[in-house]
Amino acid sequence: HMFHFSDAFIKEYLPQTIELGRSFVTLEYQSTRAGSKGLFALDNLWDGLGALTVVMPNVKYFFGKVTMYPSYHRRGRDMILYFLKKHFNDREELVTPMEPLILETSDEELRTLFCKDTFKEDYKILNTEIRKLGYNIPPLVNAYMSLSPTMRMFGTAINYEFGDVEETGILIAVDEILEDKRIRHIQTFIESHPDALKMPCESEGVFTPKVVTPQEGCCH
């Protein structure tokens, strides 16, 4: 009820897509309570998604939403969303928010700020400016940006039924996940669970992604 799905998305993408639902790390594994073991909680979530691509090789895309809270600094939020749109914008308009979030910072100011030609240069600006505000770039935003250089960003809408959080739609092509992430979260599962390749699925085949090297400056 927040996003409009185009016919092209419904026909060409959705049948081969898994939605990334909300995840919650239980208290005993949160870093503030668990110390070092909590640092691996987010990695465990990625490991689970990597396993899905092995046992369900027909899945080609992950669709989900990045959530930001109303308490986050407004100018910082605007900078992050502008940056995402500049470097990951969905030009085909496969998915669009029904009521797009309107940024409070002027487009001219943001365009002047993020004036570089590469992801790496603009990312340095973003990270510096966010820190000046006393904040950090949300971990999941960094995580998604470092997962694939071809991620698509579909715009942002407010979820009035879930605490007015601001949700940004994204799409990641499984076979375009960066090589180091593929090895870390997918190849390791294949090596430790060889029998998983024999599990039944809707289509035959084993996930064999092409190697995708980082675009210049994709953050890690």
Residue ranges and their predicted role:
Residues 155-162:
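Short proline/glycine-enriched turn/loop segments at secondary-structure junctions
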Residues 1-151, 155:
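Acyl-donor binding region in acyl/amide transferases
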Residues 73-75, 163-168:
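Short, solvent-exposed polar/charged micro-motifs at secondary-structure junctions
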